[in-house]
């Protein structure tokens, strides 16, 4: 057991200043290809300005984020299910309108 006075020396002897990077793909294969490049391209949100998508948020958007963050898992899944149903209904409506446009010949390109 280390003495109280020699504890710092023991801990400092365990430190390693070796830099472990992925310079050798044979020794350190990347678990998920592209993750290292992606992580390097991301900026630190603490020191840098907020990303562009966050700068364009309005107060209503923040309220929606807070509301979604406060939902339980079941409620969030119900919300997602509702959005999927809405997207499906919009797709059906768009399909009907495209078919209608085809029958009315308003989508044909002008032939010269």
Swiss-Prot record:
InterPro entries: DREAM_LIN52 (IPR018737). Belongs to the lin-52 family. This is Protein lin-52 homolog. Component of the DREAM complex. Signal peptide: none annotated. GO terms for biological process: regulation of DNA-templated transcription. Disulfide bonds: none annotated. GO terms for cellular component: DRM complex. It comes from the Eukaryota.
């Amino acid at each position: 057991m280390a003495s109280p006075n020699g504890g710092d020396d023991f801990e400092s002897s365990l430190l390693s200043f070796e830099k472990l990077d992925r310079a050798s793909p044979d020794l350190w294969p990347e678990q998920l290809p592209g993750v290292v490049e992606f992580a390097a391209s991301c900026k630190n949100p603490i020191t840098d300005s907020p990303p562009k998508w966050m700068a364009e948020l309005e107060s209503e958007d923040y309220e929606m984020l807070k509301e979604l963050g406060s939902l339980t898992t079941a409620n969030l899944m119900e919300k997602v299910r509702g959005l999927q149903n809405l997207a499906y209904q919009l797709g059906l409506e768009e399909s009907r309108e495209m078919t209608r446009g085809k029958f009315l010949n308003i989508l044909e390109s002008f032939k010269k």
